[in-house]
């Protein structure tokens, strides 16, 4: 049975390390950008349909430090809040939901222990469980990674998606690491490949940098688009038009190759919503 698409969702993703939002390129060369609660409230006021918080070092260090951020944010925004990173057990899920999250995102823990998907769905419901799948293009092949893109999972992409669906996952969050933070557009080939097998809502991330990218993706069968760099740097530029990108910070190798973090064309949520809703 083919899935029925609802109205597209425009989702802001905030990668958190300690008390700060950070962002890099292809999950490397991280920069501190600001306060997660302030950014989340800003995107909420702009009309975001959902916020994703991801603790990008939680899985690596075996911790979950987002509870306070989630609790404070949930008091001021009234749209779905999804939380990922460091969630390894039903207790972790319960703690995050009690803090104010509406959904949780599993990646590393699900790869290491797929039974957690079944248990989480049984305990909290399918609509609460999102499976995050991070994919990189390595030697012309799409490979799944985990621990925020640090380790190869050695799992076939299509088989993993099918397994997650069969275990009851309510949604797939597909991130193209090789497009992350580049502003070079979504990986349409990857999305096409996944669309052939996915039966649950699919939200995609990685590469949005212009209105043309948004116009192109809405013609494909995706339920939502997730943006981070494109929104963050537009927000910073609007707040301080003296902000400049330099090769003295962040991923120097990426910038040296004549690409920059600011390869974005003044994208904000209000503008994106107008395109999506037109």
What spans do the regions from the language model cover?
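Conserved anion-binding
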Residues: 16-18, 22-23, 101-179
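Glycine/small-residue-rich loop that forms an oxyanion/phosphate-binding "nest" at active or ligand-binding sites
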Residues: 66-126
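Conserved, mostly hydrophobic/aromatic
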Residues: 15, 43, 51, 83, ...
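Hydrophobic faces of well-ordered beta-strands that scaffold small-molecule active sites
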Residues: 9-14, 23, 51-53, 81-85, ...
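C-terminal helical cap(s) of enzyme catalytic domains, especially alpha/beta-barrels
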Residues: 117-124, 215-278
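Short beta-strand/loop segments at the ligand-binding rim of alpha/beta enzyme cores
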Residues: 6-9, 22, 75-83, 126-130, ...
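Catalytic cores of alpha/beta
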Residues: 77, 81-104, 189-227
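Glycine-rich, proline-tolerant flexible connector loops at the mouths of alpha/beta enzymes
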Residues: 50-69, 108, 173-184
